[in-house]
């Protein structure tokens, strides 16, 4: 039986190209492509995404008035069937790049009913080996998914624990797990 092709959007918030969370994104993408899915990876560090100013003009316009890349990324999220959000953990939270995008997505809250059935994967990396140190980050991602992406489904969480130096995640079991997750999405 042939598996239907899915539109997979991977959002890497890693500030380092080939950093640990970025490498896990690449492995997820490799698995998803091998399974026949259409994959796009966005590196937020290569995009301009300013912080939300709380002006709420977006509530009238259905788009943010800031002229940067956030609107286009949110549009891609609206059309994806699988969304991967990947972030390193900085001081018990997601990094600023991903938080800014999440905040800026408020411009399309009225459309968030469109996420029914959208599958989410979370990739979280940290130097600490204790997964509980990532719980606040995961709760923030889950809160966004639960409260703003109503009807979406969490398919899995990949923990890149104990990965501090650039590329250290390659030696961890999660590296293979990311590939397998991509194949199974």
Show the residue positions of the predicted features.
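Cofactor-binding loop segments of dinucleotide-utilizing enzymes, especially the Rossmann-like FAD-
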Residues: 13, 44, 125-127, 160
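Beta-strand-loop-alpha "switch" segments that mediate conformational coupling across diverse proteins
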Residues: 155-161
């Amino acid at each position: 039986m042939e598996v239907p092709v899915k539109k997979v959007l991977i959002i890497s918030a890693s500030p380092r190209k080939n950093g640990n969370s970025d490498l896990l994104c690449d492995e997820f993408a490799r698995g998803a492509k091998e399974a026949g899915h259409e994959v796009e990876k966005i590196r937020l560090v290569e995009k301009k995404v300013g912080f939300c100013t709380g002006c709420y003009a977006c509530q009238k316009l259905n788009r943010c008035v800031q002229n940067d890349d956030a609107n286009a990324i949110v549009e891609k999220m609206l059309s994806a069937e699988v969304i991967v959000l990947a972030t390193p953990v900085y001081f018990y939270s997601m990094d600023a790049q991903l938080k800014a995008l999440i905040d800026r997505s408020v411009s399309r809250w009225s459309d968030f009913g469109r996420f029914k059935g959208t599958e989410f994967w979370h990739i979280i990396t940290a130097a600490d080996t204790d997964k509980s140190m990532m719980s606040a980050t995961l709760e923030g991602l889950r809160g966004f998914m639960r409260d703003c992406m109503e009807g979406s489904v969490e398919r899995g969480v990949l923990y890149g624990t104990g990965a501090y130096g650039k590329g250290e995640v390659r030696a961890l079991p999660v590296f293979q797990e990311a590939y397998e997750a991509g194949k199974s999405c």
